[in-house]
C-alpha cells in the first residue's frame, strides 16, 4: 500500500481500473454462463452418442459373426482388404464466447465400401454396419473432445472471475480507500493551517489597528 502515491490523479486512475475490473467480471460471468449451457447441452449429446456407439458396435460385431459364419472368414478377410481407408479426420475450430472449441470432421469414401456385385450379402451388410460404427465413433470423439475443451474453459473462466473478485477488486478498493484517507487528512491539515494563518493575520491587523492614533483626537488637540 505504501507504494501507491496518494494523489488525485492516482485516485482517478484507480477508480477507472475498478470500473473496468467490475465490467470484466460481468462479461466473464456471462461467458461462463454461456459455456455452462453449452456444456450441459453437450453432456446430453455425448450420452446419446455413447448409447448410439454401443448399439452400432453390437450390430457391427453381430454382422461380422454372421458374415464369417455364412460367407466364411476367408471371404470376409479378403473383402476387408478391398475396403478403402478413411480419408482423414479434420479438426475445425469454432469460436464459443471467445473460446476456441474443436469440432472433428471425418471424411469417408464416397459411395459404397464394397461393390454389391460379387460381394456376399452378409459380408456386404457387415461392411455397412462397420461404417455406421465408424461414424458413431467419430461422433463420440467429437462430442467428448468438445466437452473436455469447454469444461477446461469453464474452469479457466471461473479462476479469472475469482481472481478479479477476491484479489484484484479488493486490492483496488483498498488502494482507493488509502488514497482517499490520505487526501482527506491533507485537506484537514490544510484547512487547519489556513485557519491558523488567517487567525495570525487578523490578530496582526487588530494590533496594528489598535496602535494607530485616532485622527479625530489629534484634530481636537490642535484646536
Swiss-Prot record:
Keywords: ATP synthesis, Hydrogen ion transport, Ion transport, Transport. GO terms for biological process: proton motive force-driven plasma membrane ATP synthesis. Residues 203-223 are annotated as: Disordered. The keyword Transport applies. GO terms for molecular function: ATP binding; proton-transporting ATP synthase activity, rotational mechanism; proton-transporting ATPase activity, rotational mechanism. Belongs to the V-ATPase D subunit family. Produces ATP from ADP in the presence of a proton gradient across the membrane. This is V-type ATP synthase subunit D. It comes from Thermus thermophilus (strain ATCC 27634 / DSM 579 / HB8). The gene is atpD.
Amino acid at each position: 500500500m505504501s507504494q501507491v502515491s496518494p494523489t488525485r490523479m492516482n485516485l482517478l486512475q484507480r477508480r477507472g481500473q475498478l470500473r473496468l475490473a467490475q465490467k470484466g467480471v460481468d462479461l466473464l460471468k456471462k461467458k461462463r454462463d454461456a459455456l455452462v449451457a453449452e456444456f450441459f447441452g453437450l453432456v446430453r449429446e455425448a450420452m446419446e452418442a455413447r448409447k448410439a456407439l454401443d448399439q452400432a458396435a453390437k450390430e457391427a460385431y453381430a454382422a461380422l459373426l454372421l458374415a464369417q459364419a455364412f460367407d466364411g472368414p476367408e471371404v470376409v478377410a479378403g473383402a476387408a482388404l478391398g475396403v478403402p481407408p478413411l480419408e482423414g479426420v479434420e479438426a475445425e475450430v469454432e469460436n464459443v464466447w471467445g473460446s476456441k472449441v474443436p469440432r472433428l470432421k471425418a471424411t469417408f469414401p464416397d459411395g459404397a465400401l464394397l461393390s454389391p456385385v460379387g460381394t456376399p450379402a452378409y459380408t456386404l451388410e457387415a461392411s455397412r454396419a462397420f461404417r455406421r460404427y465408424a461414424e458413431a465413433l467419430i461422433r463420440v470423439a467429437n462430442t467428448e473432445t468438445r466437452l473436455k475443451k469447454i469444461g477446461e474453459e469453464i474452469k479457466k473462466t471461473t479462476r479469472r472471475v475469482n481472481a478479479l473478485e477476491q484479489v484484484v477488486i479488493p486490492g483496488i478498493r483498498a488502494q482507493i480507500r488509502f488514497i482517499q484517507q490520505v487526501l482527506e487528512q491533507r485537506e484537514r491539515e490544510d484547512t487547519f493551517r489556513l485557519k491558523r494563518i488567517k487567525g495570525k493575520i487578523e490578530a496582526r491587523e487588530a494590533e496594528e489597528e489598535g496602535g494607530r492614533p485616532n485622527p479625530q483626537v489629534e484634530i481636537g488637540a490642535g484646536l
